[in-house]
Structure formats: C-alpha cells, structure tokens
Amino acid sequence: MATKAKPAAASKKLCAEELIREFESAQQKTDLPEIYVGDTVRVGVRISEGNRERVQPYEGVVISKRHGGMNQTITVRRIFQGIGVERVFMVHSPQVANIKVERRGKVRRAKLFYLRERVGKATRVKQRFDR
C-alpha cells in the first residue's frame, strides 16, 4: 500500500500560518493587565491633532470581551452628561497607549448588555476585592 504525499499547497499554508503567528506575537502587547468583564478600566487613547500627539483617558465599565490574540476587543461603557457612551477598543492596537484597571467588578455574566437599559444607580457594579 503506497502512502500519499502531502500536497505542496498544504505545506505552504502551514508555513504561512506560522509566519502570521510569528508576526502577531511580535506585535502583541505584553504589559497588559488581566481584564475581566465588570471591571472599571481607564484606557489611554492616542489622539493626533495636527502635528501633536496626546493621550486622552477614557474610563468606564467593561461590558464585553471578544476574540483572542491580536484581534481581542473590549467594549467600555460610561455615562457622559446623562447619555450612555460605548467604545470598542482593540486591545493590541497602537492607538491604545495603556490600560489600567481602576477597580474589579463582581458580576455573574459574560456580557453586561443589560446595563444599557439601566439608568442612574442601577448601573453600578459590585466591587470585588479578591482579584
């Protein structure tokens, strides 16, 4: 019984996957804290105005985490002048200067989309002290 040789396309694909994996690992940030849904975080966003660049903080509750690796995103929600504002940040993006966890939240859901319907004190998340 003769064994079949691997097609050349499959080995090329494997090499391409390895190249992509190496490139992504070089681009990933290593100084990020552990971020959980329910945490209150402060994200430093790089903003370029003309020829100047500054870092603008954006603070809010993490209501969602998606994907993993290079494509990991977090959705941060805050209340600004009585209106809920959500921003989605790619964690490993060069536009994100830093992420700091201000306080840990104690929640029992993976996604906190129910906070969108809540108003005022009902949007508060209990604090967790053990992490």
From Swiss-Prot:
It holds the Pfam family Ribosomal_L19. GO terms for biological process: translation. The keyword 4Fe-4S does not apply. GO terms for molecular function: structural constituent of ribosome. The keyword tRNA-binding does not apply. It comes from the Bacteria. One of its GO terms (cellular component) is cytosolic large ribosomal subunit. Keywords: Ribonucleoprotein, Ribosomal protein. Disulfide bonds: none annotated. PANTHER family: LARGE RIBOSOMAL SUBUNIT PROTEIN BL19M (PTHR15680:SF9), RIBOSOMAL PROTEIN L19 (PTHR15680). Belongs to the bacterial ribosomal protein bL19 family. HAMAP family: Ribosomal_bL19. This protein is located at the 30S-50S ribosomal subunit interface and may play a role in the structure and function of the aminoacyl-tRNA binding site. This is Large ribosomal subunit protein bL19.
